[in-house]
Amino acid sequence: MSTLARTAHVTRQTSESTIDLQLDLDGTGASEISTSVPFYDHMLTAFAKHSLTDLRVTATGDTHIDVHHTVEDVGIVLGQAIREALGDKSGIARFGDALVPLDEALVQSVVDISGRPFLVHSGEPAGFEMHLIGGHFTGSMVRHVFEAITFHAGLTVHVTVLGGRDPHHIAEAEFKSFARAFRQAKELDPRVSGIPSTKGAL
């Protein structure tokens, strides 16, 4: 089992956004989030809290045009930071799953820290992607965030919406269930010696 600090500090600057992100996978869920997209701040705060990942994010971007660039770019950087902080993945549980309700919404997430990026995202009700949540964040952004994290962190992720009506509740349950599943998958298990794969690498 690795004894190295599982932390990362990643920055990204483009013509569309500027991002500075720090995380600690073995934290307590503390967070300081400022992306200029309030609902996204709320979702990232929930992710940090329920995954027990300490997370600091400062992001600015061309939100006067659309929130898409800033939201997706933060997801990219978060994925890169997760990948860096995981290191060689020695001693991790690797797999995690969680079923999380928020009032009428119910979402299941399954995570495999596999090194093979793959996202299966299903079950959102018809029209969800068109809803404005919190005034600026469209429902379609939820999938974009998971795509960005999954690809850049090297995760296999299944997120399945099993029920729900309120777009806020559905989106929040998605982030929370992903967080809980990721929390299980990234945990260090003292019984695991080396890389949790018969191939010897992830």
Swiss-Prot record:
Instruction: Keywords in alphabetical order, please.
Output: Amino-acid biosynthesis, Cytoplasm, Histidine biosynthesis, Lyase
What EC number(s) is this enzyme filed under?
Answer: 4.2.1.19
List the GO terms this entry assigns under cellular component, sorted alphabetically.
cytoplasm
UniProt pathway annotation: Amino-acid biosynthesis; L-histidine biosynthesis; L-histidine from 5-phospho-alpha-D-ribose 1-diphosphate: step 6/9
Q: Which molecular function GO terms apply here?
A: imidazoleglycerol-phosphate dehydratase activity
Q: Which Pfam families match?
A: IGPD
Give the UniProt subcellular location, in the record's own words: Cytoplasm
Say which enzyme class the record assigns: lyase
| Gene Ontology biological process terms from the UniProt entry | L-histidine biosynthetic process
Where would you say this protein principally sits, based on its record? cytoplasm
Listed InterPro entries: IGPD_sf, ImidazoleglycerolP_deHydtase, ImidazoleglycerP_deHydtase_CS, Ribosomal_Su5_D2-typ_SF
Catalytic reaction equation(s): D-erythro-1-(imidazol-4-yl)glycerol 3-phosphate = 3-(imidazol-4-yl)-2-oxopropyl phosphate + H2O
Family stated for the protein in its record: Belongs to the imidazoleglycerol-phosphate dehydratase family.
This chain's protein is named: Imidazoleglycerol-phosphate dehydratase
Q: Which organism does this record belong to?
A: Clavibacter michiganensis subsp. michiganensis (strain NCPPB 382)
Q: Which gene encodes it?
A: hisB
